[in-house]
Swiss-Prot record:
Protein's UniProt name: Immunoglobulin heavy variable 2-4
Keyword Transcription: no
Entry's Gene Ontology cellular component terms: extracellular region; immunoglobulin complex
BP-aspect Gene Ontology terms: adaptive immune response
Domain (Ig-like) ranges: 20-116
Gene3D superfamilies: Immunoglobulins
Length: 116
């Protein structure tokens, strides 16, 4: 019975969910080889001055691959395999994080995600 009540609560009143943290991405969808991929991640429910935002990707049929992170203070860490062509920055006042990967190759085909 408790499970049904929780399910009803989640479906009927989304505000029952413990956290209203949201990360919404916007980008071009498809990018041609040799071009750059730029994605904006707009966050709500938390402050970029308090939490870092990570970027990961999932190639078709494979697991998640960590690409990099921008920390609350603005410093960044990158996967060594991408450090020469990856840039992550942010605008705290707009609650936005920016991801840019240059010189795309066929094996960069993946779904890209931002994550808290």
């Amino acid at each position: 019975m408790a499970v049904l009540v929780l399910l009803f609560c989640l479906v009927t009143f989304p505000s029952c969910v413990l956290s209203q943290v949201q990360l919404k991405q916007s980008g071009p969808g498809l990018v041609q080889p040799s071009q750059s991929l730029s994605i904006t991640c707009t966050v709500s429910g938390f402050s970029l001055t308090s939490y870092g935002v990570h970027w990961v990707r999932q190639p078709p049929g494979k697991g998640l691959e960590w690409l990099g992170v921008i920390w609350s203070g603005g410093s960044t860490d990158y996967n060594a395999a991408f450090i020469s062509r990856l840039s992550i920055s942010k605008d705290n006042s707009k609650s936005q994080v920016f991801f840019k990967m240059n010189s795309l190759q066929a094996d960069d085909t993946a779904i890209y995600y931002c994550a808290k």
